[in-house]
């Protein structure tokens, strides 16, 4: 069974490109200790369809299916079992983590898996840098950690900073739909403008959260419930 940690984006700047492996984001985020567990089994079914099972039920997960297709495992009659430590749709990068976890069950070359999962996320507009940040922590065997993505895309320069302090994560409702934001040119301009001037010199959990708060305030992405209590 493979495990892939989740990721919280704190700041990001969008870098579009026709090549999905080059397209991505720069910015900073936290890679968590919790994430996605995956097992892939060939059930010897009568159909060649690959299916996703979550909490005992078949679910739609086009990103994960596309990722394993890119690895060459389309229509193999595979059953992909996913177990999540973190909730979906709450900003934990579960879409990318699920895709990467499934890929790692089928292919042990991390770089190939990262390319497949990242491209699938780009195609479905569910993420830009989650897979890259997560992969950085996996390669260094460090999580929880803060990952700074200095360059976009699969071959972009990144740097990882271990988190030694204890921290608490609170959730207040569901987050905004990622694909909706990435498809809106006005949002892209707002986000890229807000990311200008953010420095990543002295990276600690406190400075990272402070930068994330400033970024969400400048973009208007901050949850109103959180802004009132934090």
What are these regions (language model features)?
Residues 1-86:
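ATP-binding N-lobe of GHMP and related small-molecule kinases
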Residues 9, 14, 25, 29-31, ...:
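FAD-binding core of FAD-dependent oxidoreductases
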Residues 30, 59, 90-98, 186, ...:
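Short, contiguous, pocket-lining structural segments
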Residues 69, 101-108, 214-217:
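Short glycine/serine- and small hydrophobic-enriched flexible loop segments
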Residues 73-79, 106-119:
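Phosphate-handling active-site elements
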Residues 92-112:
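DPxDG-like acidic metal-binding loop motif
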């Amino acid at each position: 069974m493979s495990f892939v940690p989740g990721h919280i984006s704190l700041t990001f700047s969008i870098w579009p490109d026709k090549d999905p492996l080059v397209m991505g984001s720069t910015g900073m985020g936290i890679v968590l200790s919790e994430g996605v567990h995956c097992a892939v089994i060939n059930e010897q079914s009568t159909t060649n369809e690959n299916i996703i099972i979550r909490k005992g039920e078949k679910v739609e997960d086009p990103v994960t299916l596309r990722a394993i297709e890119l690895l060459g495992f389309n229509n193999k009659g595979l059953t992909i079992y996913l177990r999540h430590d973190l909730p979906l749709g709450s900003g934990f990068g579960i879409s990318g983590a699920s895709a990467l976890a499934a890929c790692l069950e089928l292919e042990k070359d991390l770089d190939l898996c990262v390319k497949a999962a990242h491209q699938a996320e780009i195609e479905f507009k569910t993420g830009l840098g989650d897979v890259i940040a997560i992969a950085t922590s996996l390669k260094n065997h460090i999580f929880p950690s803060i990952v700074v993505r200095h360059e976009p895309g699969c071959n972009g320069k990144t740097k990882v900073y271990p988190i030694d302090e204890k921290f608490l994560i609170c959730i207040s409702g569901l987050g905004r739909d990622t694909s909706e934001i990435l498809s809106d040119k006005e949002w892209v301009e707002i986000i890229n403008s807000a990311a200008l001037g953010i420095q990543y010199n002295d990276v600690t959990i406190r400075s990272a959260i402070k930068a994330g708060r400033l970024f969400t305030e400048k973009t208007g992405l901050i949850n109103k419930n959180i802004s009132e209590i934090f």
